[in-house]
């Protein structure tokens, strides 16, 4: 995928970010479903409108996404994307065809192509998120998801109503890679700008980008 940082840059950035997050994001006012997928983590940059998937501490894939057009926040009814440490609480859509439309998390039977005119439903897969911090603990009740969107032309800029949108094939790919319980860290800043404290001697494996 064009416009993404180089693999080495992403590797160093992810180490720095995860180290910083581990020091600041798990205080005494935190909540967690516990258990589940502890090997995969996702870092979502609001500034970059990109998601980095990290497996066992190594970045494996980057995706173009879209967060809320109303900004960031946790207030009910605000349609904002929450910041902080979230977790995948439920996975919905096993085996659904690419482009399958969901309404209240149930398939309607309709299938849409990317950029279908005049349509903006939840499609393909749903990763229902829960908050793990006092500030974002209402995330599950607010029904904040990572989900597919037919409006793929708008990915890379804020366009959602609070959820984290992905292209249909990308969200299906992510869905197959991670399990319930995986952490999702939503940050204001850029992934690249947080790389300075990383270990520059770390080795980098091959990363699959699209």
Regions found by a protein language model. Give the residues of each.
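Bacterial N-terminal signal peptides that target proteins for export
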Residues: 2-14
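C-terminal motif of bacterial Sec signal peptides marking the signal peptidase cleavage site
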Residues: 22-25
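Exported/periplasmic cell-wall-interacting domains
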Residues: 29-33, 37, 75-78, 96-210
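Post-signal peptide N-terminal segment of mature Sec-exported envelope proteins
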Residues: 33-57
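Structural motif
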Residues: 48-50, 85, 126
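Electropositive
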Residues: 64-96
């Amino acid at each position: 995928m064009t416009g993404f940082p180089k693999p080495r840059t992403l590797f160093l950035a992810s180490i720095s970010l995860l180290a910083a997050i581990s020091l600041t994001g798990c205080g005494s006012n935190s909540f967690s479903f516990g258990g589940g997928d502890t090997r995969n983590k996702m870092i979502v940059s609001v500034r970059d409108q990109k998601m980095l998937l990290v497996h066992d501490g190594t970045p494996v894939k980057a995706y173009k996404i879209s967060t809320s057009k109303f900004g960031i926040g946790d207030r009910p009814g605000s349609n904002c994307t929450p910041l902080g440490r979230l977790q995948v609480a439920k996975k919905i859509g096993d085996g659904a065809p690419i482009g399958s439309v969901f309404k209240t998390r149930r398939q309607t039977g309709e299938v849409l192509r990317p950029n279908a005119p005049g349509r903006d439903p939840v499609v393909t897969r749903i990763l229902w998120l829960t908050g793990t911090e006092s500030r974002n603990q209402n995330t599950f009740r607010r029904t904040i998801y990572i989900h597919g969107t037919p409006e793929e032309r708008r990915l890379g800029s804020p366009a959602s109503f609070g959820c984290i949108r992905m292209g249909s094939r990308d969200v299906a790919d992510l869905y197959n890679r991670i399990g319930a319980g995986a952490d999702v860290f939503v940050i204001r800043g850029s992934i690249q700008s947080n790389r300075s404290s990383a270990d520059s001697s770390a080795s980098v494996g091959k990363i699959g980008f699209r």
